[in-house]
A protein has these predicted regions:
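Cofactor-binding loops of NAD(P)H-dependent oxidoreductases
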Residues: 4, 28-30
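Short, acidic/glycine-rich phosphate-metal binding loop used to engage nucleotide
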Residues: 2-9, 14
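Catalytic-site signature of metal-activated, phosphate-bearing donor transferases
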Residues: 11-18, 24, 28, 35-197
């Protein structure tokens, strides 16, 4: 176990990657599970790999139930990589792999148990919106007072209508609403941070 100071999700993952001594690395978070089908697909691919990075469809869960709408599935993420061919962005939150090599895709899902209940959903929403606002502040981004409600409305429309959340019942509505509210608070917090650095 390696313990370090916390500088954001991207930097932490890149630090972890620097300790890998194998040819390939699979990055998964503590709330993610490799499905048996994905495991089989990865092992088969690694016998004769054609690419240096592979992405997989992440199946997000809300209160224990899979949500296949509102942009939550397929939520593709690059997670399997040949060490040295890619690195993680230095984003505080919503980090991603940066690479210029060829990439491939798996069809089997990575299971993401992101929200065990509504309490954990609200806690995570608050934490992620704070980190995203801090990232916007670090990049010197400034926004007007109408930005939070307008971005929130667009995000809800995008998730609920354009990405099919309306076909997912209460789970589809909840997933769409969670995305919209996170966007709203991200921009509210960014505006507040720009006015008051202590916030």
């Amino acid at each position: 176990v390696v313990e370090t100071d916390w500088l954001g999700y991207g930097i932490q993952k890149q630090r972890a990657l620097s300790f890998v001594e194998t040819t390939w690395a699979l990055s998964i978070d503590c709330d993610e599970v490799v499905s048996q089908a994905l495991k089989d697909e990865i092992l088969l691919t690694l016998k004769h790999p054609c690419h240096n990075v592979y992405r997989m469809p992440r199946l997000n869960h809300l209160c224990g139930r899979p949500v296949r709408c509102a942009g939550w599935y397929p939520d593709y993420v690059d997670r399997l990589l040949r060490v040295g061919e890619a690195q993680f962005s230095d984003s505080l939150v919503h980090e991603s792999l940066v690479f210029s090599c060829s990439s491939g895709s798996f069809s089997s899902p990575l299971l993401h148990y992101s929200y065990d209940d509504l309490d954990s959903a609200i806690d995570k929403l608050n934490r992620y919106s704070s980190l995203a606002a801090m990232s916007l502040k670090q990049r010197g981004r400034r926004f007007g007072r109408l930005t939070p409600p307008l971005r929130m409305c667009y995000r809800f429309f995008y998730a609920y209508v354009l990405r099919g959340g309306c076909f997912g019942g209460l789970d589809g509505f909840s997933a769409s609403l969670l995305q919209a509210v996170e966007v709203y608070f991200k921009y509210c917090k960014a505006i507040r941070k720009a006015r008051d650095p202590i916030f």
